[in-house]
């Protein structure tokens, strides 16, 4: 990656898998108006117990949003990115989006600005985005064929009128491509989000991937459809299922030769706060933040200095571990899938019983690569575990050889072992990549001894 691009993404948790171990994002819900209807969307406001795009607990004015961002920046030194992702469309509800960015950057000039849009209104604001120093934009692109699009979007609102069917999807497609081209031409990094909808666009997403790569998209994030009936979406109410983990992985792997894939997405709420995989939004509702917070940059500056040192230390440790692995293991050695429990920082630093997700890595003699994450209910409740919860954790770890944890009790360790999953706390609080490589060398050495 060239230095200019790395400078843009190194602190952005969504645009860099490495950065998401260290840095947090914050979404503010200032843009409720939307100009399209998606069959997978129902923008429920006032809902604090769901974790999916478009959901918020409270809608904010730009002034309230700025107040909240300053309060979070003072309490969450990891904060590096302010994003506007709805609950409607940030480019359509443009005046609120623009005013929010203006108010926040007047107080916190170094915060990265990011927005997410369906793309329909984006071409109208390209030059303003440059003027505002927005250098990350996400466009949701689910199709490049209007016939496919008509199955996803019932209507759009464009040029002061509602348009339906294939014609609506044709206009949406043209505007999305114009937005993508215009953003790339202006040096703004574009992440494309695509929702994988089995039987509708699953095969088509390979074409989408090729096209957005050809036009210069920086990342392509293929996400599973969320379609539980209780969410009240058209797809949920009509029985359209989401993809299985295997189906999602198959499409991602089929697209691996196209645009760079983002695999660490958590499908955040439109008011999410914190590291990816956690949401501290309920700690910062309006009734809990000060009326007139004053921004103090000291904690964020100190944290960035610490992260810089940690990154160098982690990089050196990973390089040494990789060299040892290449020396000890044949290039043809088989791959392993290894899960880890982490609270961030790129370390194995979470108790097994507290984990609500597992980060899964693929390792072989050539190195360690992030593969995907698996969510689950945490095993420990009120200080103890439950058998049904362990069963769900085991299901989430299907296909995983080993899980590396900071700590684990005897009961869950034995339960995992009975399911063919080894739990290890030998590398508690170590960096993830060197620990996985150490495990890999150990396994390959054992295998060589058995076959010798």
From Swiss-Prot:
The EC number(s) attached to this protein equal 4.-.-.-
Q: Which GO terms describe its molecular function?
A: 4 iron, 4 sulfur cluster binding; lyase activity; metal ion binding
Q: How is the cofactor bound?
A: Binds 3 [4Fe-4S] clusters per monomer. One cluster is coordinated with 3 cysteines and an exchangeable S-adenosyl-L-methionine. The two others probably act as substrate.
Keyword Transmembrane helix in record: no
According to its UniProt record, this protein's enzyme class is lyase
Q: In which residues is [4Fe-4S] cluster 2 bound?
A: 265, 268
**Gene Ontology process terms (BP):** nitrogen fixation
Q: Which CDD domains match?
A: NifB (cd00852), Radical_SAM (cd01335)
Q: Which UniProt keywords apply?
A: 4Fe-4S, Iron, Iron-sulfur, Lyase, Metal-binding, Nitrogen fixation, S-adenosyl-L-methionine
Q: Which InterPro entries match?
A: Aldolase_TIM, Di-Nase_FeMo-co_biosynth, DiNase_FeMo-co_biosyn_sf, MoaA_NifB_PqqE_Fe-S-bd_CS, Nase_CF_NifB, NifB_C, rSAM
Where S-adenosyl-L-methionine is bound, by residue?
40, 88, 140
Looking at the record, the residues that make up the Radical SAM core domain are 20-271
> In which residues is [4Fe-4S] cluster 1 bound?
34, 38, 41
Cofactor(s) needed, names only, are: [4Fe-4S] cluster
Q: In which pathway does it act?
A: Cofactor biosynthesis; Fe-Mo cofactor biosynthesis
Note the superkingdom of the native organism. Bacteria
- Say which family it is in: Belongs to the radical SAM superfamily. NifB family.
| Function as written in the Swiss-Prot or TrEMBL entry | Involved in the biosynthesis of the iron-molybdenum cofactor (FeMo-co or M-cluster) found in the dinitrogenase enzyme of the nitrogenase complex in nitrogen-fixing microorganisms. NifB catalyzes the crucial step of radical SAM-dependent carbide insertion that occurs concomitant with the insertion of a 9th sulfur and the rearrangement/coupling of two [4Fe-4S] clusters into a [8Fe-9S-C] cluster, the precursor to the M-cluster.
The name this protein goes by in its record: FeMo cofactor biosynthesis protein NifB
Organism, as annotated: Rhodobacter capsulatus (Rhodopseudomonas capsulata)
Whichever gene encodes this chain, its name is: nifB
């Amino acid at each position: 990656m060239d230095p200019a691009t790395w400078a843009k993404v190194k602190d952005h948790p969504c645009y860099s898998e490495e950065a998401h171990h260290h840095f947090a994002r914050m979404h503010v819900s200032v843009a409720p108006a939307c100009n399209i209807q998606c069959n997978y969307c129902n923008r429920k406001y006032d809902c604090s117990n769901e974790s999916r795009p478009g959901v918020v607990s409270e809608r904010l004015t730009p002034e309230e949003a700025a107040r909240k961002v300053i309060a979070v920046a003072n309490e969450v030194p990891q904060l590096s990115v302010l994003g506007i992702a709805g609950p409607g469309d940030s480019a359509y509800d443009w005046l609120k989006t623009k005013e929010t960015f203006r108010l926040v950057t007047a107080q916190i000039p170094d915060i990265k600005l990011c927005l997410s849009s369906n793309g329909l209104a984006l071409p109208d604001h390209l030059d303003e985005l440059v003027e505002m120093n927005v250098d990350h934009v996400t466009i949701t692109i689910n199709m490049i064929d209007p016939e496919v699009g008509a199955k996803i979007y019932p209507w759009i609102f464009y040029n002061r009128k509602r348009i339906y069917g294939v014609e609506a999807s044709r206009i949406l497609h043209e505007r999305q491509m114009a937005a993508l081209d215009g953003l790339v031409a202006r040096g703004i990094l574009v992440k494309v989000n695509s929702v994988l909808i089995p039987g509708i666009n699953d095969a088509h997403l390979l074409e989408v991937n090729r096209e957005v790569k050809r036009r210069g998209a920086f990342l392509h994030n293929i996400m599973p459809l969320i379609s539980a009936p209780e969410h009240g979406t058209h797809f949920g109410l009509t029985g359209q299922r989401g993809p299985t983990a295997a189906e999602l992985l198959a499409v991602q792997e089929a697209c691996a030769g196209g645009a760079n894939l983002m695999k660490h997405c958590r499908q955040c709420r439109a008011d999410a706060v914190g590291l990816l995989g956690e949401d501290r939004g309920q700690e910062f509702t309006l009734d809990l933040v000060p009326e007139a917070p004053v921004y103090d940059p000291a904690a964020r500056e100190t944290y960035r200095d610490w992260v810089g040192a940690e990154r160098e230390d982690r990089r050196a440790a990973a390089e040494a571990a990789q060299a040892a692995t290449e020396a000890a293991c044949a290039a043809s050695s088989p791959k392993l899938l290894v899960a880890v429990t982490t609270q961030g920082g790129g370390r194995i630093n979470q108790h097994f019983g507290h984990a609500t997700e597992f980060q899964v890595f693929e390792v072989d003699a050539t190195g360690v690569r992030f593969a995907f994450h698996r969510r689950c209910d945490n095993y420990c409740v009120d200080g103890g575990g439950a058998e049904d919860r362990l069963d769900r954790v085991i299901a989430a770890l299907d296909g995983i050889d080993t899980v590396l944890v900071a700590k684990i009790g005897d009961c869950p360790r034995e339960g995992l072992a009975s399911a063919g999953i080894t739990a290890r706390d030998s590398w508690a609080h170590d960096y993830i990549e060197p620990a996985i490589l150490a495990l890999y060398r150990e396994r390959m050495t054992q295998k060589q001894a058995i076959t010798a």
